Regions:
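N-terminal juxtadomain amphipathic helix
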Residues: 1-74
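Conserved alpha-helix/loop element of class I SAM-dependent methyltransferases that forms part
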Residues: 77-95
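Conserved class I S-adenosyl-L-methionine
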Residues: 94-104
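Conserved SAM-binding loop of SAM-dependent methyltransferases across substrates and taxa
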Residues: 105-117
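Conserved SAM-binding motif I beta-strand of class I
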Residues: 118-123
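Conserved SAM/SAH-binding beta-strand->alpha-helix loop
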Residues: 125-127
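Conserved SAM-binding strand-loop segment of SAM-dependent methyltransferases
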Residues: 136-149
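A short acidic, Gly/Pro-enriched loop at the edge of an enzyme's catalytic core
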Residues: 150-159
Length: 159
C-alpha cells in the first residue's frame, strides 16, 4: 500500500476487519446478502497522513444514502455559526454564490439562502438531492469530478 499523498509505503496500524455500510437498515432476510468491506487504517511515515487502506466505490456508498444533516440540532447550530462567520469574513451578499460540495439535505446552504445569498448544492445521493430540491435548496445529484467542475463553470455561473 502506498500513500495517497506522497506515494510512500504505508504502515497499517488498526483494523476493524470487514464491516457493513453505515445506516443500512436491512430486513432480517437480507442480512446474509449484506456486503461488507475491509475497514482498516494506515499511517504514512513521511507525510503523516492517516488514511483508509481500501476505498469503497462511491456509487455503492451513495446510491441510497440514509444520513440527513438536518436531523442533528447541534449540527444545525454549527451551520448557523459557520454561515455567520463566512458571510462577515468573505463579505458574502446577493452577488455571491455559495457552492457546497457534498451538501446533503442542504442544512448548511439554507443558512445562506435565508439571508438572500444565492446557493447551489452538489451531492451524489439522488434521494437526498431530491429532498433538498423539494425544500427549495437547489441541489445537483452528481459526484464532484473534474469533468463536473468544468460543466459547472460553463453552465452554472461558477467561476
Amino acid at each position: 500500500m502506498k500513500c495517497r499523498s506522497c506515494n510512500t509505503k504505508l504502515k497499517p496500524f488498526f483494523s476493524l476487519a470487514r464491516m457493513p455500510l453505515v445506516n443500512a437498515f436491512l430486513k432480517k432476510a437480507d442480512l446474509k446478502h449484506e456486503k461488507k468491506y475491509e475497514l482498516a487504517t494506515a499511517f504514512c511515515p513521511k507525510c503523516f497522513l492517516v488514511q483508509l487502506t481500501k476505498t469503497i466505490p462511491p456509487e455503492e456508498l451513495f446510491t441510497d444514502y440514509l444520513y440527513f444533516s438536518s436531523t442533528s440540532a447541534s449540527f444545525l447550530a454549527h451551520c448557523e455559526a459557520t454561515a455567520d462567520v463566512l458571510i462577515k469574513r468573505l463579505r458574502l451578499g446577493k452577488e455571491s454564490l455559495v457552492l457546497e460540495i457534498a451538501s446533503n439535505d442542504g442544512a448548511q446552504l439554507q443558512c445562506f439562502d435565508k439571508v438572500g445569498i444565492p446557493i447551489l448544492g452538489v451531492d451524489p445521493a439522488k434521494n437526498i438531492a431530491r429532498l433538498a430540491n423539494s425544500r427549495g435548496i437547489p441541489t445537483i445529484p452528481e459526484f464532484f469530478t473534474h469533468a463536473f467542475a468544468i460543466h459547472l463553470k460553463e453552465h452554472e455561473r461558477v467561476t
